Amino acid sequence: MIKWPWKVQESAHQTALPWQEALSIPLLTCLTEQEQSKLVTLAERFLQQKRLVPLQGFELNSLRSCRIALLFCLPVLELGLEWLDSFHEVLIYPAPFVVDDEWEDDIGLVHNQRIVQSGQSWQQGPIVLNWLDIQDSFDASGFNLIIHEVAHKLDTRNGDRASGVPFIPLREVAGWEHDLHAAMNNIQEEIELVGENAASIDAYAASDPAECFAVLSEYFFSAPELFAPRFPSLWQRFCQFYQQDPLQRLHHANDTDSFSATNVH
């Protein structure tokens, strides 16, 4: 029998959080009861350690907080919450937000412009998100804003900047880089053939290695059936790094559903 952490008797000063309702989003329904219980335990600690800051009138309630915490903890379900120790605040806008962006061109000229962002991950600072795109991250579509920004945080544990190579054994770095760049080239070839909007993988993955790792991390957890057969070698590297196999999890859940359906009287 599973002992759900949120069903343990709490002190009179605590209010029970709606973990069971929070787990009902499509992305998390494939997890086993043991995995869901472990995820909730991590998410409870996440909410104790991190500060969720609503901005521009966004209203943050307990259900929203729980779902945000669950999505943050899914990538580190087996790695451990200490992998998220490089930030302490999550800033949440109600919708995509405008920021001042500074960039340098090929001849060294610095340009400034205002751009619309869905999210940001500062190297030694907070993660910035928006609720509209968080809501769009609840399904299994290949898009997940929170997992994308978490991947950047995991990436920077390996050095001063995001490189697309997370903290893995040194002997595995060359193979990881080879497979990641091969995936980028493959995605770019598809973009050139069918266009960005028709590409089966988000075109942002072809922009640089750090974004490729972040985008493919989204697909790893929310659309494994697209990632695994297309990039099998890189898929195995992701499974080894995250210590999870979402495709196997999905197949097991589908088999369980099929078995249940055939035994309905």
UniProtKB/Swiss-Prot annotation:
CDD domains: Peptidase_M90_mtfA. One of its GO terms (cellular component) is cytosol. InterPro entries: MetalloPept_cat_dom_sf, MtfA_enterob, MtfA_fam, MtfA_N. Its main location: cytoplasm. Binds 1 zinc ion per subunit. Its cofactor is Zn(2+). Its EC number is 3.4.11.-. GO terms for biological process: proteolysis. The keyword Metal-binding applies. GO terms for molecular function: aminopeptidase activity; metallopeptidase activity; zinc ion binding. The keyword Hydrolase applies. Keywords: Aminopeptidase, Cytoplasm, Hydrolase, Metal-binding, Metalloprotease, Protease, Zinc. Interacts with Mlc. Involved in the modulation of the activity of the glucose-phosphotransferase system (glucose-PTS). Interacts with the transcriptional repressor Mlc, preventing its interaction with DNA and leading to the modulation of expression of genes regulated by Mlc, including ptsG, which encodes the PTS system glucose-specific EIICB component. Shows zinc-dependent metallopeptidase activity. Belongs to the MtfA family. This is Mlc titration factor A. It comes from Escherichia coli O1:K1 / APEC. The lineage of its organism: Bacteria, Pseudomonadati, Pseudomonadota, Gammaproteobacteria, Enterobacterales.
